[in-house]
Amino acid sequence: MILTAPRRPVPAAATRTASGSVKAPGARARVAAAGRIYVEGRHDAELVESVWGDDLRVEGVVVEYLGGVDDLGRIVDEFGPGPTRRLGVLVDHLVPGSKESRIAEAVRRGPGGEHTLVVGHPYVDIWQAVKPARVGLSEWPTVPRTIEWKHGTCAALGWPHRDQADIARAWQRIRDSVRDWTDLEPELIGRVEELIDFVTQPV
């Protein structure tokens, strides 16, 4: 009698992307399309890439990092949005009456405004767009205005926060806790999906 080791079942290939979209078999990244998405904040851009990166590559949509909303007017002018060249922008902490909302309104009324969509999330920081349970919290801590939010949050979590390197490691820990779109708050999910739909809609 010949004994053979039992065969382990081969895991099925993932059928969905991290954003929940159906993964097309053999889908490859497209050549960059004319439409583009700018994301304010480095951590914001990294989170968008980690969850929606597969979808964006298939659509050929390039995501650019926006250093600050004050640069938005210049970027719109340089990009030159049009019917076949749409521009989407995700802005940090976009709430009524804020500087961000005034700049977004000026862009909407300006040249190329009808082909530009500026949306935003309501969070003080993109960290809050990750469901707090992913880092063992029931809710994100309330940090006094006198304390920088990231430092105050790390302190509440008992994480090191002495310098920027500590903050970077804290963000990596939070970002790595995100498995897919279900670990994010709907206020961010809806805005990113809205931007992707806007810049990829057919002429």
What are these regions (language model features)?
Residues 1-203:
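Acidic, divalent-metal-binding catalytic cores of TOPRIM
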